């Protein structure tokens, strides 16, 4: 019986012994997302104004001012900006004092609360404005059209463009990039 009591005491002592200390390791997991801005569908749209002169041969401002297009884009940085640069409608045919071959206008690009503008009569791009986190439509429209001399319009094709730029803030909290 002593052997049985001794065995029971040994078994109890073995189970009551403190466990070995546990050791843990930790692995941190991290990643990042770069500030980016993108246009969907290659960032391209067309404003086809059709006939831009009145029956009397002068510029039809209403036809030009009706020009509108929609771009789709996004920016994932809270300090992203947007600006516009408008280039006049030009006919490469030579004009004379009685005729105009240029149409000037104001271009506006509206994305949420941001609405930068540029006039074709001003050199360079218009002022950049904050757009922040943005995903959606950018409505581009034309207004305030005019021809330099309010003269008759030269017949032919007129070509211009409106460049809308979305810019991320790649400095992560610094100053946004400036318009060219």
Task: Locate predicted features.
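Sec/Tat signal peptide C-region and signal peptidase I cleavage site
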Residues: 15-21
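Short, surface-exposed beta-strand/strand-loop-strand elements in extracellular ectodomains
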Residues: 101-109
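Cleavable N-terminal signal peptides
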Residues: 8-9, 19
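N-terminal small/polar-rich segments of proteins
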Residues: 21-97, 128-180
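Bacterial N-terminal signal peptides that target proteins for export
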Residues: 1-6
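Extended, solvent-exposed segments with strong compositional bias
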Residues: 113-133
């Amino acid at each position: 019986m002593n052997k049985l009591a001794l065995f029971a005491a040994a078994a109890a002592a073995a189970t009551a012994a403190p466990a070995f200390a546990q050791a843990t390791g930790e692995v941190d997991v991290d990643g990042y997302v770069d500030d980016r801005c993108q246009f969907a569908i290659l960032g391209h749209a067309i404003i086809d104004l059709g006939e831009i002169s009145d029956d009397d041969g002068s510029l039809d401002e209403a036809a030009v001012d009706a020009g509108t297009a929609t771009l789709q884009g996004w920016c994932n940085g809270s300090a992203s900006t947007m600006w516009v640069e408008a280039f006049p409608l030009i006919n490469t045919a030579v004009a004379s004092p009685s005729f105009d071959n240029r149409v000037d206008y104001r271009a506006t690009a509206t994305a949420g609360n941001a609405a930068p503008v540029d006039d074709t009569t001003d050199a360079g791009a218009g002022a950049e404005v904050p757009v922040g986190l943005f995903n959606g439509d950018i409505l581009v429209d034309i207004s305030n059209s005019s021809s330099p001399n309010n003269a008759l319009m030269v017949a032919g094709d007129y070509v211009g463009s409106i460049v809308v730029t979305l810019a991320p803030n790649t400095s992560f909290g610094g100053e946004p990039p400036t318009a060219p």
